[in-house]
Amino acid sequence: MRRIGRVLHLTPGGMLIVRAEKTPNIGETVVDDNLKQVGTVFDIFGPVSSPYISIKPTIPDPATLLGKTLYAVSRREGRSWRRRS
């Protein structure tokens, strides 16, 4: 689990905008302090030195996340990956 930054604002289209401390991969799961899934990384934009992240929320009221710190969880964390035979 990696800290990605604080939520700055909510777009009219319902996306959360976060200023990135560490850049996650597109498609990674995003969780809050309580490890509750809040969305997925949709886009990364802005200058390379201080990028912004657009997160597509999966919760009914994303406005409650304004000002909160979010974390990225890679797909392999918390799961065991075995090849099916």
Q: Can you say where each PLM-predicted feature lies in the sequence?
A:
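Peripheral interaction segments used for macromolecular assembly
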Residues: 1-85
